[in-house]
């Protein structure tokens, strides 16, 4: 049994394709796997940064606050926000002559 799905053969009108036994379950399975592989490869190339970042860090968005009182949660949020806020006084301006 041949795994070729199409064979080019000379005909009266030139070269043409003749499909041989395309209803074979092995050929159908190989075609489906090939198409899925192509789709997954394209998605991987389009979204590789997102995919590998998600695999590396998971879905974690920060420490869990389960069981922590609301006052401590608010204090933590304020600390995180103050760490993000930028104070212009910390920068040094360098002027080139």
Curated annotation (Swiss-Prot):
Show the stretches that span the lipid bilayer: 23-43
Where does it reside? Virion membrane; Host apical cell membrane
The organism's place on the tree of life at top rank: Viruses
GO annotation (BP), single: symbiont-mediated suppression of host autophagy
Residues with the Phosphoserine modification: 64, 82
Q: Please indicate which residues carry the site annotation Essential for channel activity, possibly by being protonated during channel activation, and by forming the channel gate and the selective filter.
A: 37
| Membrane topology summary | Single-pass type III membrane protein
Where are the residues of the annotated region Disordered?
Answer: 60-83
Assigned keywords, A-Z? Disulfide bond, Host cell membrane, Host membrane, Host-virus interaction, Hydrogen ion transport, Inhibition of host autophagy by virus, Ion channel, Ion transport, Lipoprotein, Membrane, Palmitate, Phosphoprotein, Signal-anchor, Transmembrane, Transmembrane helix, Transport, Viral ion channel, Virion
Q: Which InterPro entries match?
A: Flu_M2
Covalently lipidated residues (S-palmitoyl cysteine) read 50
Q: Name one Pfam family in it.
A: Flu_M2
- Which Gene Ontology molecular function entries are recorded, alphabetically? monoatomic ion channel activity; proton transmembrane transporter activity
Q: Where is this site: Seems to be involved in pH gating?
A: 41
* Residue intervals on the Intravirion side: 44-97
Recorded family membership: Belongs to the influenza viruses matrix protein M2 family.
* Assembly and binders: Homotetramer; composed of two disulfide-linked dimers held together by non-covalent interactions. May interact with matrix protein 1.
Comment on protein domains: Cytoplasmic tail plays an important role in virion assembly and morphogenesis.
| Note in the entry | When the channel is activated, one or more imidazole moieties of His-37 probably become bi-protonated.
Name the job this protein performs.
Forms a proton-selective ion channel that is necessary for the efficient release of the viral genome during virus entry. After attaching to the cell surface, the virion enters the cell by endocytosis. Acidification of the endosome triggers M2 ion channel activity.
Q: What is this protein called?
A: Matrix protein 2
Source species, please?
A: Influenza A virus (strain A/Swine/Netherlands/12/1985 H1N1)
């Amino acid at each position: 049994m041949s795994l070729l799905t199409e064979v080019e053969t000379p005909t009266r009108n030139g070269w043409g394709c003749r499909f041989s036994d395309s209803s074979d379950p092995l050929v159908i399975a190989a075609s489906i796997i090939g198409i899925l592989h192509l789709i997954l490869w394209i998605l991987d190339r389009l979204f590789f940064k997102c995919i590998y970042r998600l695999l590396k860090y998971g879905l974690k968005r920060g420490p869990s606050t389960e069981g922590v009182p609301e006052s401590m949660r608010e204090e933590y949020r304020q600390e995180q926000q103050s760490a993000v806020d930028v104070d212009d006084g910390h920068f040094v301006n360098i002027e080139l002559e």
